[in-house]
């Protein structure tokens, strides 16, 4: 079960959403180029996201991810086919979940707190990557204005900006408090047993509601835009201080 749905149902829904997204690329060269540049951005975002989960669990004393080969930056260890396709076409998605055993956590944290730390590590890594690539983007624009007018410069700048967007999108999407997304485990740490039980019992309905809201209100886009706007403002302010 995933998002309260069996795999067949999930795949059908994902296929419909992808087909709906394909229209924008037909006969549109710039859109196709953007799609191609999205692929390395997806690899970076998912790989570092899942590695962050594995790294956090390992540091807390759980060697499960290490034994399963997840403590690596090899993309093949972390990619989920459906989640990766969604990230390419829809701007949000997920990687292969990192399995952990909270009972292995050291005594510095409770199992619930440890799960929350491991869960938040993934989205946090995406936001850190987004900031790093924003700084690189600003540096190129500031110090190499002629370079960005060249064909290779335009491609590199587009790749950087796509990587920023994908990382912010992946981070925001995974903070949605619905199982099995990271946000559910973070929120779970602060909820009562009754509240957790209610969420699990209504998981399917909540999932459908979230997908409808995400696709018909563009709320993910609004949240991501505010986050990216904030990052740009901070990076611009930092550059203004020193340059």
Residue ranges of each PLM-predicted region?
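Hydrophobic transmembrane alpha-helices and their immediate loop junctions
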Residues: 1-243
């Amino acid at each position: 079960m995933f998002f309260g749905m069996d795999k067949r149902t999930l795949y059908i829904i994902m296929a419909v959403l992808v087909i709906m997204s394909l229209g924008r690329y037909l006969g549109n060269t710039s859109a196709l180029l953007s799609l191609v540049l999205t692929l390395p951005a997806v690899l970076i975002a998912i790989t570092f996201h899942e590695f962050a989960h594995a790294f956090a669990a390992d540091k807390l004393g759980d060697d499960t991810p290490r034994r399963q080969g997840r403590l690596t930056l090899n993309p093949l260890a972390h990619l989920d086919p459906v989640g990766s396709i969604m990230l390419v076409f829809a701007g949000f998605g997920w990687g292969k979940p990192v399995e952990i055993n909270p009972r292995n956590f050291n005594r510095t944290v409770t199992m619930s707190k440890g799960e929350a730390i491991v869960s938040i590590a993934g989205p946090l890594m995406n936001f850190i990557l987004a900031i790093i690539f924003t700084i690189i983007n600003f540096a190129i624009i500031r110090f190499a204005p002629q370079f960005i007018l060249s064909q290779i410069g335009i491609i590199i700048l587009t790749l950087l900006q796509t990587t920023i967007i994908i990382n912010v999108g992946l981070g925001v999407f995974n903070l949605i408090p619905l199982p099995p997304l990271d946000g559910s485990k973070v929120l779970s740490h602060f909820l009562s047993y009754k509240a957790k039980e209610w969420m699990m019992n209504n998981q399917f309905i909540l999932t459908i509601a979230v997908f409808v809201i995400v696709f018909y209100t563009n709320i993910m886009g609004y949240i991501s835009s505010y986050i990216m706007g904030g990052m740009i403002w901070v990076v611009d302010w930092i550059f203004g201080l020193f340059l």
